[in-house]
């Protein structure tokens, strides 16, 4: 009876983990840096292509290791230049990765889970429930796939991916260890060399893990707020029943204090018609955030079938924004991108749609918005 050896996937190993791996097979630690550059800088998954590695070591690696990212199921490009990849992970589920170009900046929105357990009422991802956590290789693999698609070398002036946001499918803090490992690779010069200021983790408010985050990594933090009081947030973001606003904001303040350098929290606020878009909500928000240095990103709701919510009018959004501006806040309104390929914020559901169905979906969305189309007020890419 023969037994097959489970190969180590090198794609998700951080530098210390890679060095430990080479130690364990009797090789010098500097090999870790060589192999990491081939994997992350040049997108190589074939050990024979690693020409500065000896043939003997290449043969050894082929027997015990692999470089395996998620399977690309589809890649779509929006009319506005936004790209969306649907990738299949080991659990069999599909997740989505979105690239948003804007001038010299290219932001990659990365998923951390297949599905999501938090069940935010306005988010299409939450409607499908939780399926699985992604491995570190599956999280960083989304960056690897996108980078290979562009043929871009990280840490160069003309690289395609300048920013990464953990704002795709799932709650990153509920897949803590794998997300931390992937973010370290994003920032490592042997990985993707992205500045800590340009890597952002977005959370709905898992308070104990926000406190834990500061012990492990230094990245920008965004809070999915969406409501200015506990009663409303309990309805929109059910985890608020466990970690109410006072507790949540105090944890964010503690985290931001560890960063220093005058960095501020980003507040994300999805605007829902007649639910949280009134001036009195803005007034409540001003009072709520008075002790929290922050910038505010208003996100007009992106419709999806059977959501039960609508996007507010242009005037309602402007009134809300003006109220916050008058209180001294830096407020932007996010421009919807990738709507024709279901890549807009809140629309990620991990499904593969054929072109006819996607076209029908886009027409329906345009009709929903035609009566009161929102012009570009400002653009914020975190």
Swiss-Prot record:
Disulfide bonds join 109-345. Keywords: 4Fe-4S, Cytoplasm, Disulfide bond, Iron, Iron-sulfur, Metal-binding, Methyltransferase, rRNA processing, S-adenosyl-L-methionine, Transferase, tRNA processing. GO terms for cellular component: cytoplasm. InterPro entries: Aldolase_TIM, Methyltransferase_A, RlmN_N, RNA_MTrfase_RlmN, rRNA_lsu_MTrfase_RlmN/Cfr, rSAM. [4Fe-4S] cluster binds at residues 116, 120, 123. Binds 1 [4Fe-4S] cluster. The cluster is coordinated with 3 cysteines and an exchangeable S-adenosyl-L-methionine. Reaction proceeds by a ping-pong mechanism involving intermediate methylation of a conserved cysteine residue. This is Dual-specificity RNA methyltransferase RlmN. The gene is rlmN.
